[in-house]
């Protein structure tokens, strides 16, 4: 964490250079954690060019990769400005990451959309009526923390976020993206 914080990032290009190899690796492993397989070379090509060649996989994988790219673009200026974590940022990160991927009928029937809290009764997470309050409390709890236990606080944030499970889908990817943003 200290090494990361020691970098003198003055402009978006500095951050892009620093994270050049990290971004595709993060997206690749994020896909694996979600049970989706896409070759690392394809992910690297997509992050380098914004397109892929020789791809015959699930188009949803490309939508998810595009969400990762768009989310990085959205967060880049906020990382440079060292903006605190806010609930509105959580909602926007989720909206960007999952844009175009809420296609299953039960999401649509329940009126659930990317960037909106869960509305249906789920077997996991906080009750739908409590999600906003619990997420606000979590964000207040960790926002602005800059002490010596940053990694532990980031892990705590991720664990509590997943426990709240604020969205119908995309909680894992959103939580991992926000944990990295927090660090």
Where are the model-predicted features located?
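FIC/Doc superfamily catalytic core
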Residues: 1-183
């Amino acid at each position: 964490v200290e090494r990361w914080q020691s970098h003198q990032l003055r402009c978006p290009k500095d951050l892009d250079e620093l994270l050049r190899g990290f971004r595709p690796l993060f997206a690749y492993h994020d896909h694996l954690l979600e049970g989706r397989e896409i070759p690392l070379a394809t992910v690297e090509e997509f992050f380098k060019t914004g397109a892929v060649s020789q791809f015959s996989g699930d188009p949803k994988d490309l939508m998810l990769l595009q969400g990762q790219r768009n989310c990085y673009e959205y967060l880049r200026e906020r990382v440079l400005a060292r903006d605190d974590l806010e609930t509105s940022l959580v909602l926007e990160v989720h909206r960007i990451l999952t844009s175009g991927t809420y296609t299953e009928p039960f999401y649509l029937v329940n009126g659930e959309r990317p960037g909106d809290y869960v509305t249906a009764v789920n077997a996991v997470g906080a009750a739908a009526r409590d999600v906003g309050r619990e997420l606000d409390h979590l964000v207040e709890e960790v926002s602005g923390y800059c002490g010596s236990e940053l990694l532990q606080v980031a892990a705590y944030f991720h664990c509590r976020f997943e426990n709240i499970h604020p969205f119908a889908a995309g909680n894992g990817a959103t939580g991992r993206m926000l944990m990295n943003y927090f660090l």
